[in-house]
From Swiss-Prot:
The gene is glgB. One of its GO terms (biological process) is glycogen biosynthetic process. Monomer. HAMAP family: GlgB. Its EC number is 2.4.1.18. The active site is at residues 398, 451. It comes from Nitrobacter hamburgensis (strain DSM 10229 / NCIMB 13809 / X14). This is 1,4-alpha-glucan branching enzyme GlgB. Catalyzes the formation of the alpha-1,6-glucosidic linkages in glycogen by scission of a 1,4-alpha-linked oligosaccharide from growing alpha-1,4-glucan chains and the subsequent attachment of the oligosaccharide to the alpha-1,6 position. One of its GO terms (molecular function) is 1,4-alpha-glucan branching enzyme activity. It is an enzyme of class 2 (transferase). It comes from the Bacteria. InterPro entries: A-amylase/branching_C (IPR006048), Branching_enzy (IPR037439), GlgB (IPR006407), GlgB_N (IPR054169), GlgB_N_E_set_prok (IPR044143), Glyco_hydro_13_cat_dom (IPR006047), Glyco_hydro_13_N (IPR004193), Glyco_hydro_b (IPR013780). One of its GO terms (cellular component) is cytosol.
């Protein structure tokens, strides 16, 4: 055996950061030599493009081979014997770099919006040879190798080379779509880390397995676009929030696939008049019980329900039904599973090293380091990826409050102030603004939505005016106050009248969405129906009235699956919704009123055009606490676009109830939640009411019990 150089020993010991410097073809004086590292091979020969063959000398028992390549040969292959098998291989170390110098410049600047075109695993052809290019960021690693189906998961076979700024790359001939792979990383001290999934993987194995899967994501079908105005401030936006794993299930409680869901979900949501479907996170995640909110694969649709192509089919099916598709997106934290982002290159790279900054106490997860350029680029590019590759129409950003505050859920002394001594996370603020700026610049018809549970100002206001730049914000205060109010016995509601009024004091401070989300039907909070007081008749009447109150209130709408037909029990992610309830008339009535409310909201401009504008709302009756009656006028952009909404939150019928209106003449009762069609007592105003004689136009109305009525002027 030849005495090994230090470089050769580094190859054999798996700690070489640039194996191309030693392996492959090299000129030494007047010779062309080939070095190959093929552990377990007993014999290796080099075959040039002319058919010439040279036997390489084994220079180390670990599988290091050396020999001459005939002068003038430009291409060659390796013919190796493994036991009784002889295979012919392309040498990965004869190919040029994957990343260009300009690529490395953009990556170093952290401004590459299409990071996903360069990092990860991409099937490509180099020098006429098909294979897969692998690129991963691990700046603090001593060595990185690719392991997978193509090399028997042998970390010795395919060491990568490091380029500028810690990007490691390798083209592996023959690696193809469908191959599983991971990265084998050696840290600075020489210790082997647990095998890591690719942070940029476009697909992964079904849990509990954690390997990444090679996918040609550039070949995904071009999505059918949604209408350009679907997210507009003046448009009706009614969102159906869905957890794909529990909306419906198949035989033996199995998950439905993306394609099975595509056959039913879009048509169902569209038939009820919803304008959007919001998907709880589909990013790959290891734990079902996280509902997707602890992702390890931000670029991969979960394989629980199928392939990336299958997911694209579902999005396309939604668009063909006229639905926008929103995705819950989690850039605030990630789990510390060994195969994931935590301690990725042997250091706290994606997360903060200090647990006072880097660990989320509520969820025992890791917090992204928004001060690191590469991490911010990774996250922003991920947002753009979903809008670009899958044609999604918007992103709902989860847990924004936990990102904005350094002391979120932390006791005194358990957090580190910012450079000004404050509690605001300045780096997270900068990240959110950059995220919104780049999303709207590249996808002007998309939207972004913040789940922000505090009074942080200007969340949905322009960045140039000091805002965070979101398109919309969930109105968590409205949700908490109104659910608390409607959950009280009607006899006590007069003492809590202000809970309804208070929301209108700030209803136009943001572009609000009124959310009845999944968070309100778990953890012993009960279902929305389960919160309603009284006997069965009153519970269902309360529910119908509450939904109508929401649709009459300023703000866009969101309803979690199951609420639309009065799901009785809390949501359980391990089981389908209780669809059998629709065999009962009272649940059919709830579904019918939701369908009609969506239609009314869409068809009456006054109910949606000025959802986010104070000009679109006027109190008509706000101080009738004794009777728990509220009346208000919704207004559209045109002069006669009006809709009168009156809510009676007691079981008492109020007759001859006088309400002032802006126009004399006939007003049509457009919807009455007490209609027998919905399971109500059918008290109402016989379809049309005419104003009384007098200087000021007034209506004399019958207010049905525990009900909301909508009236619009004839010829409006």
């Amino acid at each position: 055996m030849i005495e090994l150089s230090s470089e050769a020993r580094a190859i054999v010991e798996g700690r070489h950061s640039d194996p191309f410097h030693y392996l492959g073809r090299h000129r030494e004086n007047d010779r062309q030599v080939v070095r190959a590292y093929l552990p377990e091979a007993s014999d290796v020969r080099v075959v040039d493009e002319h058919g010439g063959e040279t036997t390489l000398t084994r220079i180390h028992d670990a599988g290091l081979f050396l020999g001459d390549l005939p002068n003038g040969a430009k291409r060659y292959r390796l013919r190796a014997r493994f036991g009784a098998d002889t295979v012919e291989l392309e040498d990965p170390y004869r190919f040029p770099p994957i990343l260009s110098d300009f690529d490395l410049y953009l990556l170093g600047e952290g401004t590459d919006q299409r990071l996903y075109d360069k990092l990860g695993a991409h099937p490509i052809t180099m020098d006429g040879v098909g294979g897969t290019g692998f690129v991963v960021l691990a700046p603090n690693a001593r060595a990185v190798a690719v392991v997978g189906d193509f090399n028997c998961w042998d970390r010795r076979r395919h060491p990568m080379r490091v380029r500028g700024n810690g990007y490691w790359e390798l083209f592996i001939p023959g690696a193809q779509t469908g191959d599983r792979y991971k990265f084998a990383i050696t840290d600075k001290s020489g210790s082997l880390l647990p095998l890591k999934s690719d942070p940029m993987a476009f697909a992964a194995e079904v849990r509990p397995n954690t390997a990444s899967i090679v996918v040609d994501e550039a070949a995904l079908p071009c999505p059918t676009p949604a209408a350009a105005t679907i997210n507009a401030r003046r448009a009706p936006i009614s969102i159906y929030e869905v957890h794909l794993g529990s909306w419906r299930r198949g035989d033996d409680n199995r998950w439905l696939s993306y394609r099975e869901l595509a056959d039913t979900l879009p048509r169902y949501a569209s038939s009820l008049g919803f304008t959007h479907i919001e998907l709880m996170p589909v990013n790959e995640h290891p734990f079902d019980g996280s509902w997707g909110y602890q992702p390890t694969g931000l670029y991969a649709p979960t394989s629980r329900f199928g392939s990336p192509d299958d997911f694209a089919h579902l999005v396309d099916a939604c668009h063909r039904e006229g639905l926008g598709v929103l995705l819950d997106w989690v850039p605030g934290h990630f789990p510390d599973d060994p195969h994931g982002l935590g301690h990725f290159d042997g250091t706290a790279f994606y997360e903060h090293a200090n647990p006072l900054q880097g660990r989320h106490l509520d969820w025992d997860t890791l917090i992204y380091n928004y001060g690191r350029t590469e991490v911010v680029n990774f996250l922003v590019a991920n947002a753009l990826f979903w809008l670009d590759r899958y044609g999604l129409d918007g992103l709902r950003v989860d847990a924004v409050a936990s990102m904005l505050y350094l002391d979120y859920s932390r006791a005194e002394g358990g957090w580190i102030p910012n450079k000004h001594g404050g509690r605001e996370n300045l780096e997270a603020i900068a990240f959110l603004r950059r995220f919104n700026r780049e999303v709207f610049a590249k996808f002007p018809h998309a939207t972004t939505i913040a789940e922000e549970s505090t009074a942080w100002p200007q969340v949905s206001r322009p960045i140039e005016f000091g805002g965070l730049g979101f398109g919309y914000k969930w109105n968590m205060g409205w949700m908490h106050d109104t659910l608390d109010y409607i959950g009280k016995d009607p006899i006590y509601r007069k003492h809590h009248h202000g809970q309804i009024l208070f929301g209108l004091h700030y209803a136009f401070s943001e572009n609000f969405i009124l959310p009845l989300s999944h968070d309100e039907v778990v953890h012993e909070k009960r279902s929305i129906l389960g919160r309603m007081p009284g006997d069965d008749w009153q519970r269902f009447a309360n529910l119908r009235a509450y939904y109508a109150f929401m649709f009459g209130h300023p703000g866009k709408k969101l309803m979690f699956m199951g609420a639309e037909f009065g799901q009785e029990r809390e949501w359980n992610h391990d089981h389908a919704l209780d669809w059998h309830l629709l065999d009962q008339a009272r649940h059919q009535g709830v579904q019918a009123v939701v369908r009609d409310l969506n239609a009314l909201y869409r068809d009456v401009p006054a109910l949606h055009e000025l959802d986010c504008d104070p000009a679109g709302f006027e109190w008509i009756m706000a101080n009738d606490a004794d009777r728990s009656v509220f009346a208000w006028m919704r207004k559209g952009e045109s002069g006669r676009a009006r809709c009168l909404v009156i809510a009676n939150f007691t079981p008492t019928v109020h007759r001859s109830y006088r309400v002032r209106v802006p126009f004399a003449g006939k007003w049509r009762e457009a919807l009455n939640t007490d209609s027998a069609h919905y399971g109500g007592s059918n008290v109402g105003n016989n379809g049309v009411v005419e104003t009384l004689d007098g200087v000021i136009p007034e209506l004399s109305l019958t207010l049905p019990p525990l009900a909301v009525i909508f009236l619009v002027p004839e010829r409006a």
